[in-house]
């Protein structure tokens, strides 16, 4: 048995080295010990229209008697299209039991994206522009989640009345929490306007590991002194209801002028309701650590906060 595991481990290491050599920076190590990896796959166009992130975990039985545990991360990939792609990957495994199949999986996904890009329907960029044009007359800032990027970078649409550009605020990173191979980590920044929210998200996604997280849930609360109201919003990023729960926690703690992003790297084992507990615990811990639960104004000043800008108020969620 030990010899079998040793052989599987050697074959896995050889395949991992080969994937890193072939795909370079597109191949990302999420957890080297748990053997969790991801790769960003595009349709091979100079300006990619469709992209997808394949996340895999290699069990000890792979490639001998078990397939990789995988997840397809792309907000646009749903329903029948997702089922068909998953079926094609499973067919590759069934035809190659006992063999290394990661390369075949990646290229199969790439072929599917290339075929999709050749269809005449508008790509995600065109669809997003149409949606923005429909709400162009609204005054409130709007959070857009472009479906074309599987590593989830957001493009915040800012109204014409938004404040002048603010500098990037400092970003703090909390201690990670790991449970059954899933890892959660919170990131915090003081913010006083939507432009800073945008800058913080962009800066976080420059980090390849954060960008490849299965979910990046976030919420922010900005106090508008002139109106004595809050500008606040949240994003689930595929983890249903997680953003709203995070925002509710921030409301209960009565924090102001701060945003929290919680990254989750899925480890292949479902956690059930425990995942929400870990998300909120990560957020609470970093808010307490940075003193936002005591005196939000003084805490923000310790980060070098600027004077509150007068943003338009967005409806609470």
From Swiss-Prot:
An example molecular function term from Gene Ontology annotations: actin binding
SMART domains for this protein: RWD (SM00591)
Residue intervals passing through the bilayer: none
Bias kind Basic residues: ranges: 303-317
Gene3D superfamilies, alphabetized: Impact, N-terminal domain (3.30.230.30), Ubiquitin Conjugating Enzyme (3.10.110.10)
Compositionally biased tracts (Acidic residues): 132-141
Chain segments carrying region Disordered: 117-151, 295-317
GO cellular component: cytoplasm
Pfam family, one: UPF0029
Subcellular location per the Swiss-Prot or TrEMBL entry: Cytoplasm
Subunit details: Interacts with GCN1; prevents the interaction of GCN1 with EIF2AK4/GCN2 and inhibits EIF2AK4/GCN2 kinase activity. Interaction with RPL39; this interaction occurs in a GCN1-independent manner. Associates with ribosomes; this interaction occurs in a GCN1-independent manner. Associates with actin; this interaction occurs in a GCN1-independent manner.
Official protein name in the record: Protein IMPACT
Native species: Rattus norvegicus
Lineage: Eukaryota, Metazoa, Chordata, Craniata, Vertebrata
């Amino acid at each position: 048995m030990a010899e079998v595991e040793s052989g599987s481990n050697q074959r896995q290491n050889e395949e991992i080295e080969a994937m890193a050599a072939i795909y370079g920076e597109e191949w990302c190590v999420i957890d080297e010990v748990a053997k969790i990896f991801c790769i960003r796959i595009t349709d091979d166009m100079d300006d990619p229209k469709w992209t997808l992130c394949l996340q895999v975990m290699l069990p000890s039985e792979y490639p001998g008697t078990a397939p990789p545990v995988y997840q397809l991360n792309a907000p646009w990939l749903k329903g029948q299209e997702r089922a068909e792609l998953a079926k094609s990957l499973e067919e590759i495994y069934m035809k190659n039991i006992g063999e290394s199949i990661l390369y075949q999986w990646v290229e199969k996904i790439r072929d599917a994206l290339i075929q999709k890009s050749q269809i005449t329907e508008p790509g995600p960029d065109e669809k997003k522009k149409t949606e923005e044009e429909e709400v162009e007359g609204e005054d409130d800032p709007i959070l857009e989640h472009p479906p074309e990027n599987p590593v989830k970078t957001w493009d915040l649409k800012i109204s014409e009345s938004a404040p002048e550009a603010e500098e990037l605020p400092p970003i703090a990173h909390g201690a990670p929490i790991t449970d059954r191979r899933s890892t959660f980590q919170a990131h915090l920044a003081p913010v006083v306007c939507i432009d800073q929210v945008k800058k913080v998200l962009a800066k976080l996604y420059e980090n390849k590991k954060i960008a490849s997280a299965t979910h990046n849930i976030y919420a922010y609360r900005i106090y508008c002194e002139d109106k004595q109201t809050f500008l606040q919003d949240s994003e689930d990023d595929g983890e249903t209801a997680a953003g709203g729960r995070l925002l509710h926690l921030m409301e209960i703690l009565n924090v102001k002028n701060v945003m929290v992003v919680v990254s989750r790297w899925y480890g292949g084992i479902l956690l059930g309701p425990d995942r929400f507990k870990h998300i909120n615990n990560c957020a609470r811990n970093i808010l307490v650590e940075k003193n936002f639960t005591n005196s939000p104004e003084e805490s923000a000043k310790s980060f070098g906060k600027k004077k509150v800008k007068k943003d338009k108020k967005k409806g609470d969620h």
